[in-house]
């Protein structure tokens, strides 16, 4: 059974490697579609780390959104204690790679692109925070967890640290995430909610504009003190006051004063992009419908032509038979 499942895919190349496994580009044999699989050795993990894997699989399986990395399948090899999580392939890498390229070339990312990325990550977060079965906290939003597909559309991924909160429970406890992007309440190991994701997204946007994290330090204690103070410089002056204000709002030290996904979605720069996207999606659906109708019309036309051809053939046959009858009768 395992061999049958594994034989559905052909490994192409290694993308990355970590402590517990690797990520490889693969090809689905049935249709040639390029995907990735995350190969993890759960035999080396403690119970907490195993829980992170189960959490990622369960959350990805339930989340269906154009700005969230799509989950396809999972294969478990109990003999070698490995799990293969099969997901969408994002060929243009992640935002950390984009930031590095911009730093090397001494070029800033245009404000329009920043707003586009902002809108798409926010759309993904909206799907998480407003999930019908309970809020899903990502808990590790950072540039390297935001991927780009072939058309530079944003895909939020790596839900290994995610946690679902029931509608009755509004807060989580535990120190998780990447230190540079952790919220003050996470640093202090206090209770936190979905507003921690908003802080982390604000940090990502700051880094996209400034090409460096908002808080930098040589040790964890110094970094923690800077994050808790929450003092950051303005983003480069080439960017608008509007964008700067929104980023600073997202990075408010008091989580109760930070915006929600709903607050951010109602901002003019965001709402207009969401509307434009909905119009494009509606147009794309309409075009598919039109193409289907056109295809059906063409098939009907082909059938009509075929019927006419057969009728003509039958008429000619009938005419020939009549002529033969007349000859024999004479």
Give the label of every model feature segment.
Residues 53, 57-58:
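Regulatory alphaC helix of protein kinase catalytic domains
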Residues 80-94:
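Conserved short submotifs of the Hanks-type protein kinase catalytic core
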Residues 12-19, 23:
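Protein kinase glycine-rich loop
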Residues 117-118:
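Activation segment signature within eukaryotic-like protein kinase domains
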Residues 70-83:
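Short beta-strand micro-motifs within the conserved protein kinase catalytic domain, predominantly
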Residues 197:
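Conserved catalytic-loop aspartate of Hanks-type protein kinases
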Residues 22-44:
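Glycine-rich ATP phosphate-binding loop
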């Amino acid at each position: 059974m395992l061999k049958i499942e594994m034989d559905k895919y052909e490994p192409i190349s290694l993308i990355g490697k970590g402590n517990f496994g690797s990520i490889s580009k693969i090809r689905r044999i049935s249709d040639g579609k390029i995907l990735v699989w995350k190969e993890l050795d759960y035999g080396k993990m403690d119970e907490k780390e195993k829980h992170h894997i189960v959490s990622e699989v369960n959350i990805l399986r339930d989340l269906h959104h154009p700005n969230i990395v799509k989950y396809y399948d999972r294969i478990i090899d109990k003999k070698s204690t490995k799990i293969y999580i099969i997901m969408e392939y994002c060929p243009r890498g992640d935002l950390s790679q984009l930031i590095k390229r911009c730093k090397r070339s001494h070029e800033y990312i245009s404000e329009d692109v920043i707003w586009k990325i902002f809108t798409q990550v926010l759309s993904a977060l909206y799907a998480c925070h407003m999930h019908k079965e309970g809020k899903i906290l990502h808990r590790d939003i950072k540039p390297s967890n935001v991927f780009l597909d072939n058309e530079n559309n944003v895909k939020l991924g790596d839900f290994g640290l995610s946690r679902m909160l029931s509608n009755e429970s509004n807060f989580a406890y535990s120190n998780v995430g990447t230190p540079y992007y952790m919220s003050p309440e996470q640093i202090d190991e206090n209770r936190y909610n979905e507003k921690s994701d908003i802080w982390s997204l604000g940090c990502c946007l700051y880094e996209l504009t400034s090409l460096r994290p908002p808080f930098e330090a040589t040790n964890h204690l110094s970094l923690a003190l800077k994050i808790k103070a929450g003092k950051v410089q303005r983003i480069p002056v080439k960017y608008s006051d509007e964008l700067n204000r929104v980023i600073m709002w997202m990075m408010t030290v008091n989580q109760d004063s930070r915006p929600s996904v709903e607050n951010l979605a109602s901002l003019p720069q965001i709402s207009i992009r969401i509307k434009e996207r909905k119009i494009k999606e509606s147009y794309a659906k309409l075009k598919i419908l039109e193409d289907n109708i056109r295809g059906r019309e063409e098939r009907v036309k082909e059938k009509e032509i075929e019927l006419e051809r057969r009728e003509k053939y039958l008429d000619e046959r009938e005419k020939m038979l009549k002529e033969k009858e007349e000859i024999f009768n004479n």
